[in-house]
Amino acid sequence: FVSLYGKAIQQNTRVANEQGLLATVRYLPQKKLELSGYLDVFRFPCPTFNSRFDNAKGIEGMLQSLAQIGAGWQLMARYQIRSKQQTYNYKSQVLKEYVMRHKIRLSSLFKATRGDVAVQLDAAYTAKQRGTSSKGIMASCRGSYKASKRVTAKAFMGIFFTDDTDSQLYV
């Protein structure tokens, strides 16, 4: 089922071999301010890519604020947390552990008649139950300029630093 006119609060997810409950909320306290969030409690009845055991459990949540500041200027702040059971190898044993990921995003978007500019800062921190952790940070900027009806120039620039793939970040 896909809602053609629905506004998806949870992004970039694929439900596969999963059971759970997802609750979302969207609140407009003022005309130029939107608050939204979700809470997703889930379990995988069969083994998955990251967990070789049945019944791996997890919880994910997100809070986001979006504010319109003046004509064409928008600010956004987002916090996401996810805790999920995964397996790892220790000597000759396969063990389960909880992996917790925190992600923060701050972004600013300015739109004008002939173009736009967006600046974004992301940070991630991952902690595993066995005591290891990793962190990552990314800064990015993108822009576009419409010179005419047929010609538009676009540019993107980004830099990121991560300890490993556990703290990976996406634009």
Stretches with model-predicted labels:
Residues 1-171:
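Exposed, low-structure sequence patches enriched in small/polar residues
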